[in-house]
Each structure stands twice: as C-alpha cells, then as structure tokens.
Regions:
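Extended ligand-binding clefts on enzyme/binding-domain cores
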Residues: 1-145, 152-158, 180
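C-terminal functional modules
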Residues: 122-227
C-alpha cells in the first residue's frame, strides 16, 4: 500500500495518494518484472478508497490508517475532509472511466455528489468532519472542480450534469492562498472531464498511437453522465 512518506511518516497513508488508474496502466505496460506488483497495488488502492469513504457522506479523511480509518496525528483537523482529500473523488472516477474494473466507484461518486448537492450547489463549504459537520464554509474552486470529475463515475445523470456544469462555469482561479489546490486542480479537472487527459497505448513502430480518452458527456436528465 502507498505510504504517506518513506521515512518518518511511513506508518500512515493518504487517500489522495491512491491512484489505481495509473497503477493499472503500469501493470499493463510497465517493465514486465514490475507488472504483478502494480496490479496488486491497483487492487489494494481500489479497496482502500471504498474503506476510507464515509458510509453516508462519501467524505474521506486527509490522512488515514491502513485499514481506512482516519488518523488525526496532528489533531482532529488532519482526520477531517480537507484539501488533500478533495482529490480523492478524481482518483476513483478516472479509474472507473479508464478501466471500469470496480463498480463500487459508481456508488462512491453518487454518495459524495448527493451529499454536496444537499449542502447547496453554489455555497457548499470545503472542510468537513466525515459525518458531514461543516468546519469551513469557503466555496473553493478546487473542490468544485474535482467534484465535477466525480461525474465520470456517477450513475445519476441529472445530478452529474449539475456538477459538470459547475466545473465548466468556474472562473479561472486567481487566489494566491490556494494556487495549487484551486488552480492546478481546476486545470487537471478540465482535462479529465473533457477527455484531454489520455492514456496513449504503446504501439511499437506505429506512427500514431491510439488514444484512450475519458470525457464527461452532458446527458439528458434520465441518462448517465459517464459512458
């Protein structure tokens, strides 16, 4: 399982570091001697994300123990849903869209989007206790963006459309406080949702490699958001 750090923080993990979409890619096309390891890592991370997500809200902790439970090693705030945790829905949703190996990821997106929809699409806060208790009411572009990517795995077309449109309608982030969490996550989310963050399958001697894309299709209200 991925560690938070190889040195003094090697007794904990971070759900946002679990990237099964990439592990699966390396398991298919990485060095042959490493492929079995990456295949196991992908399976472990898929299971971990399910364990880490709260059963009602879908929120995940910023830092966690290896069994999926939150770990507040620096106080309660490090066990809450905070900036690192914004990225987690993007991780499982891209994995679902690229590889489609874990049907549980669809429920994770549904659960998370259902929670944030209930808090007000234009006003929901960005820091929460896992049970849905609000900690900070800042409506952050970075979280709006990654919640939009969650539509890649959602089964509720009408709800997924709301979150995708919220991503699309974001102003370009200009905050100097969260230049990464707002700025870069917004950029990455637009790439994911538009299908421009791609897997290029290796094709020896091929002039043009076939691109495998992810994209959110804005559906009719009765259809699903992810194909």
């Amino acid at each position: 399982m991925i560690l938070f750090s190889p040195d003094e923080r090697n007794n904990m993990t971070d759900a946002s570091y679990h990237l099964p979409a990439f592990y699966e890619l390396w398991a298919r096309w990485g060095p042959e001697e490493d492929r079995a390891l990456w295949a196991r890592a992908a399976a472990v991370s898929r299971d971990y994300l399910v364990k880490a997500a709260h059963s009602k809200t879908g929120l995940v902790p910023n830092f966690g123990q290896f069994d999926g439970s939150p770990w507040g090693f620096r106080g309660p705030e490090t066990a809450a849903f905070r900036e690192d945790a914004w990225r987690v829905a993007m991780n499982w949703s891209v994995d679902r869209s690229w590889w489609g190996k874990d049907s549980r990821q669809r429920e994770l997106s549904d659960r998370l989007q259902r929670f944030f929809e209930s808090q007000g699409m234009e006003t929901y806060g960005d820091n929460w206790k896992l049970d849905g208790t609000l900690i900070r009411d800042r409506h952050s572009p970075g979280l709006v963006a990654t919640n939009g990517v969650a539509s890649l795995a959602s089964t509720d077309g009408a709800r997924a459309r709301k979150f995708t449109e919220a991503l699309w309608n974001l102003d370009v982030p200009s905050s100097k406080v969260f230049r990464y969490y707002d700025g870069l996550l917004s950029l990455m989310s637009l790439l994911h949702a538009s299908g421009r963050f791609q897997v290029i399958e290796p094709k020896p001697r091929a002039v043009n490699a076939r691109a495998s894309r992810t994209a959110v299709t804005l559906p009719r209200a009765s259809s699903t958001a992810a194909r």
